Regions:
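Transmembrane-helix signature of 12-pass secondary carriers
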Residues: 2-226, 230-237, 257-311
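Short intracellular "coupling" helices and adjacent cytoplasmic loop segments at the cytosolic face
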Residues: 239-256
Length: 311
Protein backbone atom coordinates (compact mmCIF):
# COMPACT_ATOMS: atom_id res chain seq x y z
CA UNK A 1 0.00 0.00 0.00
CA UNK A 2 1.32 3.47 -0.89
CA UNK A 3 3.14 5.51 1.69
CA UNK A 4 0.88 7.92 3.49
CA UNK A 5 -2.28 5.85 3.00
CA UNK A 6 -3.96 6.21 6.37
CA UNK A 7 -6.25 3.70 8.02
CA UNK A 8 -9.75 5.01 7.35
CA UNK A 9 -13.29 3.77 7.45
CA UNK A 10 -14.21 1.48 4.59
CA UNK A 11 -17.90 2.31 4.76
CA UNK A 12 -19.28 2.66 1.24
CA UNK A 13 -21.19 5.87 2.03
CA UNK A 14 -19.01 8.76 3.24
CA UNK A 15 -18.69 12.52 3.24
CA UNK A 16 -16.66 13.99 0.40
CA UNK A 17 -13.59 14.74 2.55
CA UNK A 18 -13.59 11.20 3.95
CA UNK A 19 -13.94 9.84 0.43
CA UNK A 20 -11.03 12.05 -0.66
CA UNK A 21 -8.92 10.77 2.24
CA UNK A 22 -9.66 7.19 1.18
CA UNK A 23 -7.75 7.81 -2.06
CA UNK A 24 -4.56 7.74 0.00
CA UNK A 25 -1.46 9.84 -0.50
CA UNK A 26 1.25 8.90 -2.94
CA UNK A 27 2.27 9.07 -6.58
CA UNK A 28 -0.73 11.02 -7.86
CA UNK A 29 -0.36 13.72 -5.22
CA UNK A 30 3.31 14.18 -6.09
CA UNK A 31 2.38 14.48 -9.77
CA UNK A 32 -0.30 17.05 -8.95
CA UNK A 33 2.05 19.29 -6.94
CA UNK A 34 4.77 19.01 -9.61
CA UNK A 35 2.26 19.96 -12.30
CA UNK A 36 0.82 22.96 -10.48
CA UNK A 37 4.29 24.06 -9.40
CA UNK A 38 5.51 24.03 -13.00
CA UNK A 39 2.35 25.86 -14.10
CA UNK A 40 2.96 28.59 -11.51
CA UNK A 41 6.57 28.77 -12.67
CA UNK A 42 5.20 29.51 -16.14
CA UNK A 43 3.05 32.29 -14.72
CA UNK A 44 6.08 33.88 -13.01
CA UNK A 45 8.12 33.54 -16.21
CA UNK A 46 5.47 35.32 -18.26
CA UNK A 47 5.01 38.18 -15.79
CA UNK A 48 8.49 38.84 -14.39
CA UNK A 49 10.20 37.85 -17.64
CA UNK A 50 9.41 41.26 -19.12
CA UNK A 51 11.73 42.77 -16.50
CA UNK A 52 14.66 41.20 -18.33
CA UNK A 53 13.35 41.54 -21.87
CA UNK A 54 12.54 45.26 -21.80
CA UNK A 55 16.13 46.50 -21.27
CA UNK A 56 17.35 44.58 -24.34
CA UNK A 57 14.39 45.02 -26.69
CA UNK A 58 14.09 48.79 -26.35
CA UNK A 59 16.24 49.48 -29.43
CA UNK A 60 14.31 47.12 -31.72
CA UNK A 61 10.97 48.47 -30.48
CA UNK A 62 12.13 52.09 -30.13
CA UNK A 63 11.05 52.38 -26.49
CA UNK A 64 11.44 55.54 -24.44
CA UNK A 65 12.03 55.42 -20.65
CA UNK A 66 8.34 56.20 -20.18
CA UNK A 67 7.41 53.33 -22.50
CA UNK A 68 9.46 50.96 -20.37
CA UNK A 69 7.55 51.92 -17.24
CA UNK A 70 4.01 51.53 -18.56
CA UNK A 71 4.93 48.46 -20.57
CA UNK A 72 6.17 46.65 -17.45
CA UNK A 73 2.73 46.95 -15.86
CA UNK A 74 0.86 45.31 -18.76
CA UNK A 75 0.75 41.69 -17.51
CA UNK A 76 -0.24 42.73 -13.99
CA UNK A 77 -3.06 44.98 -15.22
CA UNK A 78 -4.35 42.12 -17.38
CA UNK A 79 -4.25 39.70 -14.44
CA UNK A 80 -6.15 42.11 -12.18
CA UNK A 81 -8.84 42.68 -14.81
CA UNK A 82 -9.58 39.02 -15.50
CA UNK A 83 -8.72 37.06 -12.33
CA UNK A 84 -12.30 37.10 -11.03
CA UNK A 85 -13.65 36.16 -14.44
CA UNK A 86 -11.48 33.03 -14.52
CA UNK A 87 -12.66 32.09 -11.03
CA UNK A 88 -16.28 32.39 -12.14
CA UNK A 89 -15.66 30.34 -15.28
CA UNK A 90 -13.84 27.66 -13.28
CA UNK A 91 -16.78 27.43 -10.87
CA UNK A 92 -19.24 27.00 -13.72
CA UNK A 93 -17.32 25.20 -16.48
CA UNK A 94 -14.71 23.23 -14.55
CA UNK A 95 -11.14 23.71 -13.37
CA UNK A 96 -9.47 21.44 -15.90
CA UNK A 97 -11.27 22.83 -18.96
CA UNK A 98 -10.56 26.47 -18.08
CA UNK A 99 -6.94 25.82 -17.11
CA UNK A 100 -6.27 23.99 -20.37
CA UNK A 101 -7.99 26.66 -22.49
CA UNK A 102 -6.21 29.58 -20.81
CA UNK A 103 -2.77 27.95 -21.04
CA UNK A 104 -3.18 26.98 -24.71
CA UNK A 105 -4.31 30.44 -25.79
CA UNK A 106 -1.86 32.24 -23.49
CA UNK A 107 1.15 30.29 -24.75
CA UNK A 108 0.16 30.71 -28.41
CA UNK A 109 -0.28 34.48 -28.03
CA UNK A 110 3.01 34.72 -26.12
CA UNK A 111 4.92 32.94 -28.89
CA UNK A 112 3.26 35.10 -31.55
CA UNK A 113 4.26 38.22 -29.59
CA UNK A 114 7.93 37.32 -30.07
CA UNK A 115 7.48 38.22 -33.75
CA UNK A 116 6.07 41.69 -33.03
CA UNK A 117 7.47 44.28 -35.46
CA UNK A 118 6.82 47.32 -33.23
CA UNK A 119 6.05 48.40 -29.68
CA UNK A 120 2.29 48.71 -30.03
CA UNK A 121 1.87 45.27 -31.57
CA UNK A 122 4.02 43.82 -28.80
CA UNK A 123 2.01 45.69 -26.14
CA UNK A 124 -1.36 44.46 -27.46
CA UNK A 125 -0.16 40.87 -27.70
CA UNK A 126 1.45 40.93 -24.24
CA UNK A 127 -1.74 42.36 -22.77
CA UNK A 128 -3.76 39.62 -24.48
CA UNK A 129 -1.32 37.04 -23.16
CA UNK A 130 -1.74 38.51 -19.67
CA UNK A 131 -5.51 38.08 -19.90
CA UNK A 132 -5.02 34.34 -20.32
CA UNK A 133 -2.08 33.71 -17.97
CA UNK A 134 -4.35 35.10 -15.28
CA UNK A 135 -6.31 31.83 -15.44
CA UNK A 136 -3.57 29.53 -14.12
CA UNK A 137 -2.40 32.12 -11.59
CA UNK A 138 -5.92 32.32 -10.14
CA UNK A 139 -6.92 28.64 -10.37
CA UNK A 140 -3.71 26.70 -9.76
CA UNK A 141 -4.01 26.70 -5.98
CA UNK A 142 -7.69 25.72 -6.03
CA UNK A 143 -7.04 22.85 -8.43
CA UNK A 144 -4.10 21.57 -6.37
CA UNK A 145 -6.05 21.76 -3.12
CA UNK A 146 -8.99 19.86 -4.57
CA UNK A 147 -6.77 17.00 -5.78
CA UNK A 148 -5.32 16.35 -2.32
CA UNK A 149 -6.85 15.05 0.94
CA UNK A 150 -7.42 17.57 3.70
CA UNK A 151 -4.69 16.05 5.89
CA UNK A 152 -2.02 16.94 3.29
CA UNK A 153 -3.66 19.90 1.54
CA UNK A 154 -1.81 22.72 3.31
CA UNK A 155 1.54 21.03 2.81
CA UNK A 156 0.96 20.44 -0.92
CA UNK A 157 -0.21 24.00 -1.56
CA UNK A 158 2.86 25.31 0.27
CA UNK A 159 5.12 23.09 -1.85
CA UNK A 160 3.37 24.22 -5.03
CA UNK A 161 3.77 27.84 -4.02
CA UNK A 162 7.52 27.30 -3.59
CA UNK A 163 7.80 27.36 -7.38
CA UNK A 164 6.82 31.04 -7.30
CA UNK A 165 9.87 31.71 -5.13
CA UNK A 166 12.04 29.52 -7.36
CA UNK A 167 10.70 31.41 -10.37
CA UNK A 168 12.29 34.64 -9.15
CA UNK A 169 15.64 32.84 -9.50
CA UNK A 170 14.75 30.82 -12.60
CA UNK A 171 13.79 33.85 -14.70
CA UNK A 172 17.08 35.81 -14.27
CA UNK A 173 19.18 32.65 -14.66
CA UNK A 174 17.44 31.76 -17.90
CA UNK A 175 17.77 35.35 -19.12
CA UNK A 176 21.47 35.31 -18.24
CA UNK A 177 21.89 32.11 -20.29
CA UNK A 178 19.98 33.25 -23.41
CA UNK A 179 20.41 37.01 -23.79
CA UNK A 180 24.24 37.01 -24.25
CA UNK A 181 23.89 35.02 -27.48
CA UNK A 182 24.80 37.12 -30.49
CA UNK A 183 22.62 36.24 -33.45
CA UNK A 184 20.44 38.24 -35.77
CA UNK A 185 18.16 36.37 -38.17
CA UNK A 186 16.83 38.78 -40.76
CA UNK A 187 13.20 37.96 -41.47
CA UNK A 188 11.21 40.00 -43.94
CA UNK A 189 9.49 42.08 -41.25
CA UNK A 190 11.75 41.79 -38.15
CA UNK A 191 15.26 41.00 -37.00
CA UNK A 192 15.00 37.89 -34.82
CA UNK A 193 17.32 38.44 -31.85
CA UNK A 194 17.93 36.56 -28.56
CA UNK A 195 15.25 38.47 -26.64
CA UNK A 196 12.61 37.16 -29.04
CA UNK A 197 13.81 33.61 -28.43
CA UNK A 198 13.61 34.24 -24.68
CA UNK A 199 9.95 35.25 -25.03
CA UNK A 200 9.25 31.87 -26.65
CA UNK A 201 11.17 29.99 -23.95
CA UNK A 202 9.18 31.72 -21.22
CA UNK A 203 6.01 30.34 -22.87
CA UNK A 204 7.24 26.72 -22.82
CA UNK A 205 6.02 25.84 -19.29
CA UNK A 206 2.45 26.61 -20.35
CA UNK A 207 2.85 24.60 -23.56
CA UNK A 208 4.02 21.60 -21.54
CA UNK A 209 1.36 22.02 -18.83
CA UNK A 210 -1.42 22.37 -21.41
CA UNK A 211 -0.49 18.90 -22.66
CA UNK A 212 -0.04 17.38 -19.19
CA UNK A 213 -3.40 18.58 -17.87
CA UNK A 214 -5.19 16.58 -20.57
CA UNK A 215 -3.91 13.48 -18.73
CA UNK A 216 -5.09 14.66 -15.30
CA UNK A 217 -8.64 14.33 -13.95
CA UNK A 218 -11.13 17.10 -13.36
CA UNK A 219 -11.39 18.20 -9.74
CA UNK A 220 -13.55 15.61 -7.93
CA UNK A 221 -14.71 18.34 -5.55
CA UNK A 222 -15.96 20.48 -8.45
CA UNK A 223 -17.88 17.52 -9.90
CA UNK A 224 -19.28 16.72 -6.47
CA UNK A 225 -20.44 20.31 -5.98
CA UNK A 226 -22.10 20.17 -9.40
CA UNK A 227 -24.04 17.06 -8.40
CA UNK A 228 -22.13 14.90 -10.90
CA UNK A 229 -21.65 12.18 -8.33
CA UNK A 230 -20.63 9.25 -10.52
CA UNK A 231 -18.03 11.32 -12.40
CA UNK A 232 -16.62 12.54 -9.09
CA UNK A 233 -16.39 9.01 -7.72
CA UNK A 234 -14.77 7.82 -10.94
CA UNK A 235 -12.03 10.45 -10.60
CA UNK A 236 -11.52 9.59 -6.93
CA UNK A 237 -11.17 5.90 -7.80
CA UNK A 238 -8.59 6.85 -10.45
CA UNK A 239 -6.57 8.82 -7.87
CA UNK A 240 -6.88 5.87 -5.48
CA UNK A 241 -5.60 3.51 -8.18
CA UNK A 242 -2.55 5.67 -8.99
CA UNK A 243 -1.70 6.12 -5.31
CA UNK A 244 -2.11 2.52 -4.19
CA UNK A 245 -1.53 0.47 -7.33
CA UNK A 246 -4.88 -1.24 -6.76
CA UNK A 247 -7.65 -1.63 -9.31
CA UNK A 248 -10.05 1.37 -9.36
CA UNK A 249 -12.91 -1.03 -8.64
CA UNK A 250 -11.37 -1.66 -5.20
CA UNK A 251 -11.95 1.94 -4.13
CA UNK A 252 -14.03 1.53 -0.93
CA UNK A 253 -16.51 4.39 -1.45
CA UNK A 254 -19.58 3.84 -3.61
CA UNK A 255 -21.57 6.99 -2.82
CA UNK A 256 -21.47 10.20 -0.78
CA UNK A 257 -23.46 11.34 2.16
CA UNK A 258 -26.08 13.72 0.78
CA UNK A 259 -24.44 17.08 1.20
CA UNK A 260 -23.69 19.51 -1.61
CA UNK A 261 -21.84 22.76 -1.83
CA UNK A 262 -24.44 25.44 -2.42
CA UNK A 263 -22.03 28.31 -3.04
CA UNK A 264 -21.19 27.27 -6.60
CA UNK A 265 -24.80 26.91 -7.71
CA UNK A 266 -25.66 30.13 -5.90
CA UNK A 267 -22.77 31.80 -7.72
CA UNK A 268 -24.23 30.82 -11.09
CA UNK A 269 -27.50 32.49 -10.11
CA UNK A 270 -25.75 35.62 -8.87
CA UNK A 271 -23.70 36.16 -11.99
CA UNK A 272 -20.12 37.35 -12.31
CA UNK A 273 -20.77 41.08 -11.70
CA UNK A 274 -22.47 40.55 -8.34
CA UNK A 275 -19.80 38.10 -7.26
CA UNK A 276 -17.11 40.63 -8.19
CA UNK A 277 -18.85 43.30 -6.14
CA UNK A 278 -18.91 41.03 -3.10
CA UNK A 279 -15.16 40.43 -3.47
CA UNK A 280 -14.44 44.17 -3.69
CA UNK A 281 -16.10 45.04 -0.37
CA UNK A 282 -12.75 46.15 0.99
CA UNK A 283 -14.21 47.75 4.09
CA UNK A 284 -15.14 44.28 5.39
CA UNK A 285 -11.51 43.11 5.30
CA UNK A 286 -9.56 46.36 5.47
CA UNK A 287 -6.63 45.11 7.59
CA UNK A 288 -6.16 41.97 5.50
CA UNK A 289 -6.39 44.00 2.30
CA UNK A 290 -3.68 46.44 3.42
CA UNK A 291 -1.42 43.57 4.51
CA UNK A 292 -1.93 41.85 1.14
CA UNK A 293 -0.94 45.03 -0.74
CA UNK A 294 2.32 45.30 1.24
CA UNK A 295 3.14 41.63 0.65
CA UNK A 296 2.52 41.88 -3.09
CA UNK A 297 4.65 45.02 -3.30
CA UNK A 298 7.43 43.19 -1.47
CA UNK A 299 7.34 40.26 -3.88
CA UNK A 300 7.06 42.19 -7.14
CA UNK A 301 8.59 45.57 -6.34
CA UNK A 302 12.10 44.28 -5.80
CA UNK A 303 12.17 42.81 -9.31
CA UNK A 304 11.02 45.96 -11.10
CA UNK A 305 14.00 48.23 -10.51
CA UNK A 306 15.91 47.05 -13.57
CA UNK A 307 13.13 48.06 -15.94
CA UNK A 308 14.40 51.56 -16.55
CA UNK A 309 18.01 50.53 -16.92
CA UNK A 310 19.61 50.34 -20.33
CA UNK A 311 21.50 47.33 -21.58
Amino acid sequence: MASGFDKLSTASKQSFEDAMSNTGFGKFNKISVAFVGFMLLGMISETLGLSYIIPVCHCDLKMTPTDKIWFSSIPFVAIIITSHMWGYLADTKGRKKILCFSMVVGSIVSIISSFSPNLYTFAVLRFTCGLFISGPSALGYAYLGELNPISHRDKMITLGNASVILGTAFVPLLSWAVLPFDFNVNLWFINYRPWRLLVCIFALPYVICAFVITKLPESPKFLYAQGRIQESLKNLSYIYSVNTGNNPSEYPVSTYLQFFFKHISDGRKQGILLRKWNLFKVYLHKKKYILMIFLIQGVTGRTRGILTSDS
